[in-house]
Amino acid sequence: VTKRFFVTGTDTEVGKTIASSALLQAANLLGFHTAGYTPVASGSELTGDGLRNEDALALQRHSRVALRYDQVNPYTFAEPTSPHIISADEGRPIAAARLSSGLRELEGLADWVLVEGAGGWFTPLSDSLTFADWAQAEQLPVILVVGVKLGCINHAMLTAQAVRQAGLPLAGWIANDVQPPGKRHAEYLATLKNRLAAPFLGEIPWLADIAQRDDLGQYLDLRALDPALSTAPAAAHPAP
């Protein structure tokens, strides 16, 4: 059975892609055949191959399964704005069925699929659909990325509550240091650990060259996602 997780964040620009890259790297180290999926991405650049989003390219690079770009990111938009706005402007409606068919395809290729959302939990994809709606329909366990800074405690608790109200498990959370640790950093972290009531998967430190790093998996412990991982050798996960 393919393991599936949905990565959301307390806000935009809190390091979801950094955390997703770290999760893929950690799962790769455990021998899983991983696939990253960010079905909707805005803020992309025109290349010789067409529009390309740097977050989607990162997930493609860290996926153990060789994937085409369109398998990782079926909906790509140039302007860095909310997906429902730019998709309406361009006349390219985002369909939940397309998001799901892309996920099914990856489930057939990998045994560990990581889905990265856009923005925060309730990011709209259309006038009638949010990323939360789709994650709920797919019954995806959620991993929350918390950008550690002033205000993150409230944002994290609100998001965790919304995830649980959707009937989805909060499988774990990651602290991402989006700035050099400040005076109250340790206290923010302690409060989050005390109040989130979900497994803490690890803290990704502030690193200047973090987007280029291939060793971020060392900062995460995936055993909280599946206790069986503590004894699972790499050979236990053959190619599907």
Identify the residue ranges that each predicted region occupies.
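N-terminal phosphate/diphosphate-binding loop that engages ATP/GTP or pyrophosphate donors
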Residues: 4, 18-93, 97, 102-105
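Hydrophobic anchor at the beta1->P-loop junction of P-loop NTPases
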Residues: 7
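C-terminal lobe/tail of nucleotide-utilizing enzymes
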Residues: 160-240
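Inter-motif core of Ras-like GTPase G domains
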Residues: 126-149
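Conserved glycine(s) of the Walker
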Residues: 14-15
